[in-house]
From Swiss-Prot:
This is FMN-dependent NADH:quinone oxidoreductase. The keyword Lipoprotein does not apply. The gene is azoR. Pfam families: Flavodoxin_2. Belongs to the azoreductase type 1 family. It comes from Acidovorax sp. (strain JS42).
Length: 216
């Protein structure tokens, strides 16, 4: 089993989402010892934001690419191949200004490739990255999930659910720690709840794998 571990928080060791992704990966490895882990730090190894040079190789153009286009194509190819090779993807997604970090958005722009992660058909778009499990470690300074107003301001989890679904990923799970900037007690409670969610997601996947094996 191949697991891709992605972090995107700019705050390094102070990051809650990085703490949660590390806990998730360790729990997954404990439950699935044969798992092979690849790591992508989108702050240390950030893809450039999307440009025409990055887009050109994906519009059917194969000959006569400029040096800049070839460089950007190599970056996009590395990232999409890494994503497609993974059975499980763990994504650290902190809540920045009501959405996700620009580094994570730049990664999504690179892997959103027609013919690779999705295609358009006579019946509409079809995702091509089916069969993956994605666990998103979502961290928020405030609390946005418990009120209609808060949910209306949230373009982090909802966006990731949408774009991953567009890629064909139907098994998207969220480990959420919110209210982490609302005092020590609130942060401790949020981290405890997130730890329980990690355990539940890993156990649920292991139980489902056991059922599949028995059915086979």
């Amino acid at each position: 089993m191949q697991l891709l571990h992605i972090d995107s928080a700019i705050t390094g060791d102070q990051s809650v989402s990085r703490q949660l992704t590390a806990q998730t990966v360790e729990a997954w490895k404990a439950s699935h010892p044969a798992t092979q882990v690849s790591y992508l730090d989108l702050v240390a190894d950030a893809p450039a934001h999307f440009t025409m040079d990055a887009m050109a190789p994906r519009t059917g153009q194969t000959d006569g690419l400029s040096e800049a286009q070839q460089r950007e194509n190599a970056v996009s190819e590395r990232l999409v191949s890494q994503f497609l090779a993974a059975d499980v993807v763990v994504i650290g997604a902190p809540f920045y200004n009501f959405a996700i970090p620009t580094q994570l958005k730049a990664w999504i722009d690179r892997i959103a490739q027609p013919g690779r992660t999705f295609q358009y058909t006579a019946n509409g778009p079809e995702g091509l990255a089916k069969g993956k499990t994605v666990i998103v470690a979502s961290s928020r300074g405030g609390v946005y999930s418990t009120s209609e107003g808060g949910r209306a301001m949230e373009h982090q989890e909802s966006y990731l659910q949408t774009v991953l679904g567009f890629f064909g990923v139907t098994d998207v799970r969220f480990v959420r720690a919110e209210g982490v900037a609302m005092g020590g007690d609130a942060k401790a409670q949020a981290l405890a709840a997130a730890a329980q969610a990690i355990e539940a997601h890993v156990k649920a996947h292991a139980a489902n794998q056991d059922r599949v094996s028995q059915a086979a």
